[in-house]
Amino acid sequence: MHNPLLAKAIWQHLPETYRLRLASIDVIDCLDSTQTWLDQQLPTLQREWRLCAAVQQKAGHGRQDRVWFSGSGQVAFSWRGWVAVEPEYVGLFSLNAALAVQSALITLGVSQVQLKWPNDIYIADRKLAGMLTTVVQRRGHLCDVILGIGLNRLSIALPSEAIALEGKIARLPSVAELIAAISHQWLRRLDALSSAHGRAEIREAWLSSALWLGLPIKVWQGNQSVEGIWLGITDRGALRLATNTGEQVFMADEVKLRPLD
């Protein structure tokens, strides 16, 4: 069932200029996945975006086929739209989205937000939010993209390695405020993906808050792992690792990483 009151609240919290970039906002009380719902809809036209949020999400998409549950009071939503960007730079989508989440949290009063490659948001070395980017189709340099985000707003039923905004901020924002603030920053940052200068800014800004940068880490690729020093990321968003046999580069959809004990 659709929830027009929450959709209206998100719309009202968005700055008026950025409302023009959204073709629609759909909020549904219970969904398997906001990404799946948007994938089943017709793509938006050019620079317009569609937003789908769920009050309860039963099977959100994660990396490496993980499934995530998000209950009432948490934040689960996805965007779908066209972006003008060369296909080789699609790896920067998640990094740019992470910067949008970070900027939104800072404006809401959250400090010391850390970014974990390639698509997670951390506070105090614990996971606050994650995201997943899917390229649905391409037309030249235009990419039809679905970007899903899940954020722990409430601390109820979280695993020990996760953290929530609840108790970490003076005033806990509503779900509508959080979705609107993140959407505002995402729409504001979209154009950066289309130019070399903008992509360089994404890379520099992301590295300035990167978790474990310059430290020993272990990278898993399937059942195999490799250890090394995390050097940073390439101009396409891939991870650079200094190992005993030289530098290795890993793409975001191939690996997971952890710090060495």
Residue ranges and their predicted role:
Residues M1-W11, R21, E86-P87, G91-V113, ...:
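Long, positively charged amphipathic alpha-helical accessory segments at protein N-termini or as interdomain linkers
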